């Protein structure tokens, strides 16, 4: 049976087109996906991301567990509230999921994982946690909102009690804190996001969600669907699990080598394979593409390079650039001239560094 967030009726009342996303009925847009995209780049938008899975980890051995479980190093997390992006790998070095981990106390960490991977993530984490006597708690009592855009932080802080505003305004990137709502319920506010814009992601009790959503809409924040969330994240150069990487792809093959820490004394799952890949290189790579001709890059399209064939992973029309952009996985090596097969035509594309857009600004290499 399809799942619904606490805001399902609210989305429908706002005219949202609802679709099935990983077993959840979610808004794809509220009228115009392109208008929603531009509003986040220029102002502030709010996303219902309550389909994401929140997992709390409790116990004196949580940090040793995470040193084993994650390819990035939780030893970086020393200040309560600090967050880290990491891949969780299988023994073959493939990506089980990408996630954000928060350090709350030495005996208390928090994961935010993808909706599509909920069941396998929980099974894998529980299996690994048993050896460390760590309690794994799924927080189904919490909803999650993302408020993103250049005006997002101001719109959120203006709704908070004055006693909390200063701390929230000073919150650094990839950091979180807990504050009390006007009804004395706890809001977990994190300066993170999936759009390439500044803003907050907020975990809050289910029963508080509609009130906060409506309060933000009254300030001029617009509701944004998952369609614009996808074009925003692709412009920002952010991977989508299941499309840009999966259990057959290592971080080095998904342009996520920067998330791998081969620090001494930490034998994380999949490390041996990644060490070999680091030494010997990988046979395939993920690259960014931009197409100057009219048309759209789509998942699965064949990509032709001097080294051989690959395929488009994520592809879309970029509202900010007014051109088609995408990620492709192709054979390793300098791609040189690249073409994409679209309806039996070989269309030239340019290889560009990503992100394509950061905080509303086209990156300087895009139109070189």
From Swiss-Prot:
Instruction: List the molecular function annotations (GO) for this entry.
Output: aminomethyltransferase activity; transaminase activity
Give EC number(s), comma-separated: 2.1.2.10
What this protein catalyses is: N(6)-[(R)-S(8)-aminomethyldihydrolipoyl]-L-lysyl-[protein] + (6S)-5,6,7,8-tetrahydrofolate = N(6)-[(R)-dihydrolipoyl]-L-lysyl-[protein] + (6R)-5,10-methylene-5,6,7,8-tetrahydrofolate + NH4(+)
Q: Name one Pfam family in it.
A: GCV_T_C
Q: Write out the entry's keywords from A to Z.
A: Aminotransferase, Transferase
Q: SUPFAM superfamilies annotated for this entry?
A: Aminomethyltransferase beta-barrel domain, Folate-binding domain
Q: What class of enzyme is it?
A: transferase
Record-level GO BP terms: glycine decarboxylation via glycine cleavage system
Looking at the record's lineage, which domain of life comes first?
Answer: Bacteria
- Assigned GO CC terms: cytosol; glycine cleavage complex
The similarity annotation says: Belongs to the GcvT family.
What HAMAP family does UniProt report for this protein, alphabetically? GcvT (MF_00259)
Q: What does this protein do?
A: The glycine cleavage system catalyzes the degradation of glycine.
Query: What PANTHER family does this protein map onto?
Result: AMINOMETHYLTRANSFERASE (PTHR43757), AMINOMETHYLTRANSFERASE, MITOCHONDRIAL (PTHR43757:SF2)
Subunit note: The glycine cleavage system is composed of four proteins: P, T, L and H.
Q: What is this protein called?
A: Aminomethyltransferase
> Which organism's genome codes for this protein?
Xylella fastidiosa (strain 9a5c)
Q: What is the lineage of its organism?
A: Bacteria, Pseudomonadati, Pseudomonadota, Gammaproteobacteria, Lysobacterales
């Amino acid at each position: 049976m399809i799942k619904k967030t606490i805001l399902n009726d609210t989305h429908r009342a706002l005219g949202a087109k609802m679709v099935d996303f990983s077993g959840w009925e979610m808004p794809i847009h509220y009228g115009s996906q392109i208008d929603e995209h531009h509003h986040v780049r220029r102002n502030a938008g709010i996303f219902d991301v309550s389909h994401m899975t929140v997992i709390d980890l409790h116990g004196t051995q949580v940090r040793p567990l995470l040193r084993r479980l994650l390819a990035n190093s939780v030893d970086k997390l020393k200040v309560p509230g600090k967050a880290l992006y990491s891949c969780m790998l299988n023994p073959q070095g493939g990506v089980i999921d990408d996630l954000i981990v928060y350090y709350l106390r030495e005996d208390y960490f928090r994961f935010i994982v993808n909706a599509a991977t909920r069941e396998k993530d929980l099974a894998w984490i529980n299996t690994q946690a048993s050896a460390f006597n760590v309690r794994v708690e799924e927080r189904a009592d919490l909803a999650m909102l993302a408020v993103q855009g250049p005006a997002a932080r101001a719109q959120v802080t203006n709704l908070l009690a004055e006693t909390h505003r200063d701390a929230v305004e000073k919150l650094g990137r990839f950091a979180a804190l807990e504050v009390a709502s006007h009804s004395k319920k706890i809001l977990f506010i994190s300066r993170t996001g999936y759009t390439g814009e500044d803003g907050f992601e907020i975990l809050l009790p289910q029963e508080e969600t509609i009130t906060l959503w409506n309060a933000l809409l009254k300030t001029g924040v617009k509701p944004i669907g998952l369609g614009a969330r996808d074009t925003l994240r692709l412009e920002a150069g952010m991977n989508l699990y299941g499309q840009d990487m999966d259990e057959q792809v290592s971080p080095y093959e998904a342009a996520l080598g920067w998330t791998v820490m081969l620090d001494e004394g930490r034998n994380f799952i999949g490390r041996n394979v990644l060490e070999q890949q680091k030494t010997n290189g990988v046979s395939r790579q993920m690259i960014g593409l931009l197409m100057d001709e009219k048309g759209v890059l789509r998942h699965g399209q064949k990509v032709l390079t001097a080294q051989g064939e690959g395929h488009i992973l994520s592809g879309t029309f970029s509202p900010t650039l007014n051109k088609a952009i995408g990620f492709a996985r192709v054979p390793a090596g300098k791609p040189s001239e690249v073409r994409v097969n679209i309806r039996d035509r070989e269309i030239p594309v340019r290889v560009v560094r990503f992100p394509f857009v950061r905080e509303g600004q086209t990156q300087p290499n895009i139109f070189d």
